[in-house]
Amino acid sequence: MAKNVTGRITQIMGPVVDVQFEGELPYILNALETRVGDRRLVLEVAQEIGERTVRCIAMDSTDGLARGDEVRDTGEAIAVPVGPETLGRILNVIGEPIDERGPIPTTRTAPIHRQAPSFDEQATSAEILVTGIKVVDLLAPYLKGGKIGLFGGAGVGKTVLIQELINNIAKGHGGVSVFAGVGERTREGNDLYHEMIDAGVIKLGEGTTEGSKVALVYGQMNEPPGARMRVGLSGLTMAEYFRDEEGQDVLFFVDNIFRFTQAGAEVSALLGRIPSAVGYQPTLATDMGALQERITSTKKGSITSVQAIYVPADDLTDPAPATSFSHLDATTTLNRAIAEKGIYPAVDPLDSTSRALDPRIVGEEHYNVAREVQRILQSYKSLQDIIAILGMDELSEDDKLTVARARKIERFLSQPFHVAEVFTGSPGIFVPVEDTVRSFKAICAGEYDHLPEAAFYMVGTIEDAVKKAESLNATA
């Protein structure tokens, strides 16, 4: 493919730009470059529409672009800088730094489009990733090198949970992390950057970020759909370099996968494709598969990914979240009804799943305690209609005991977060998985039936609940 072939813009429709070439046509997914004033604008070829014209998607605003402007074909896909030099920096979808700390000092780049690792290159592990969050570690544990989805509607705590996971896992994790901000709030991206600096995960020296452990790639809500659709791939390309070339175990955080799908739907409509169910692009499953299949662990290294996934109108059967489900090893589902009770994290203990909850992986004791906790909560759920109509007095003694324990378990699944300390005033708690299993085993066995419900709310281990009960009695 010849580089530096030039064409001219014939039509601009918002983020969609048509470019006509006299000579060779660029390939689909090639990056084209043009100048708008003093800035570089990258276009990605999406379609060939005849008459030597290609239809492209802009990766930035097309304000100031005019018909007749010259466009150069780079001869390759969008390429972003990769390697240790990206750590401690904030980049955009095309790999340009946006943190006002000068250019990235590397000539190493990698194209954002590539094949997923082949079947024989892939590797799986059966090692648990401890998060320090009780409800996750007990009922839907995460696997090292696995894919984790945090599902939830608007305002139930996905971003807070992903930030707590960054706090608990990334800070104690020896390797590197990559965070892709896909179509979310710029303010949250800014807060995360400063939190990472405060925590020492990003080290800012005089003109250097040496010693940093995380690279940030942002394509936020105000960006055009092309940028939001591709920024996840840009972040993933950086994570793949650390996995493949340096053999590292990488943590890859994405907030939010739904915005990737949403941007794909916008682009699809702009390109004139006939939409499928609920207005999504007809290629929804293909687009999701192209991204998700690359997020995997190989014999060289691993990528453990944590993805926040917005659920439109709290409907888990919506095509966007439903398409994500099949790619994940563990799902943590956040429930508005639990958030309304003031129980945070608002994780639904009966709706969250993990393929790691297996006695061969977590051990017999952990598995049995988790299943007993779910059995008690399920019994309570099925009794709620009877309680609502007839009241607690009509229940048998056994059922009353089940309800009392379930309410204590529900409250004990709450936990103060480190990242929410400034709002709650309660110091965050990291609970080791052994303490979590031991505490819930004792509650299920009835050893703490005498403690009041309030003692179990927003504490760490069972010992903290006992102390809280004593202080409640003292003030009563």
Curated annotation (Swiss-Prot):
Q: What is its main location?
A: membrane
Its annotated function is as follows: Produces ATP from ADP in the presence of a proton gradient across the membrane. The catalytic sites are hosted primarily by the beta subunits.
UniProt GO MF annotations: ATP binding; ATP hydrolysis activity; proton-transporting ATP synthase activity, rotational mechanism
User: What PROSITE patterns has UniProt attached to this entry?
Assistant: ATPASE_ALPHA_BETA
- What is the protein's quaternary organization? F-type ATPases have 2 components, CF(1) - the catalytic core - and CF(0) - the membrane proton channel. CF(1) has five subunits: alpha(3), beta(3), gamma(1), delta(1), epsilon(1). CF(0) has three main subunits: a(1), b(2) and c(9-12). The alpha and beta chains form an alternating ring which encloses part of the gamma chain. CF(1) is attached to CF(0) by a central stalk formed by the gamma and epsilon chains, while a peripheral stalk is formed by the delta and b chains.
Pfam families membership: ATP-synt_ab, ATP-synt_ab_N, ATP-synt_VA_C
Give the record's family classification: Belongs to the ATPase alpha/beta chains family.
Q: Carries keyword Transport?
A: yes
InterPro entries recorded:
AAA+_ATPase (IPR003593), ATP-synt_VA_C (IPR055190), ATP_synth_F1_bsu (IPR005722), ATPase_a/bsu_AS (IPR020003), ATPase_alpha/beta_chains (IPR050053), ATPase_F1/V1/A1_a/bsu_N (IPR004100), ATPase_F1/V1/A1_a/bsu_N_sf (IPR036121), ATPase_F1/V1/A1_a/bsu_nucl-bd (IPR000194)
Give the protein's recorded name.
ATP synthase subunit beta
Localized where? Cell inner membrane
Name the enzyme group at the top EC level.
Answer: translocase
Q: What is its EC number?
A: 7.1.2.2
Q: Which parts of the sequence bind ATP? A: 152-159
A GO CC annotation recorded here is: plasma membrane
Topology of this chain in the membrane: Peripheral membrane protein
Q: Which reaction does it catalyse?
A: ATP + H2O + 4 H(+)(in) = ADP + phosphate + 5 H(+)(out)
In terms of PANTHER family, this protein maps to: ATP SYNTHASE, ATP SYNTHASE SUBUNIT BETA, MITOCHONDRIAL
In terms of Gene3D superfamilies, this protein maps to: 2.40.10.170, Bovine Mitochondrial F1-atpase, Atp Synthase Beta Chain, Chain D, domain 3, P-loop containing nucleotide triphosphate hydrolases
Keyword annotations from UniProtKB, A to Z: ATP synthesis, ATP-binding, Cell inner membrane, Cell membrane, CF(1), Hydrogen ion transport, Ion transport, Membrane, Nucleotide-binding, Translocase, Transport
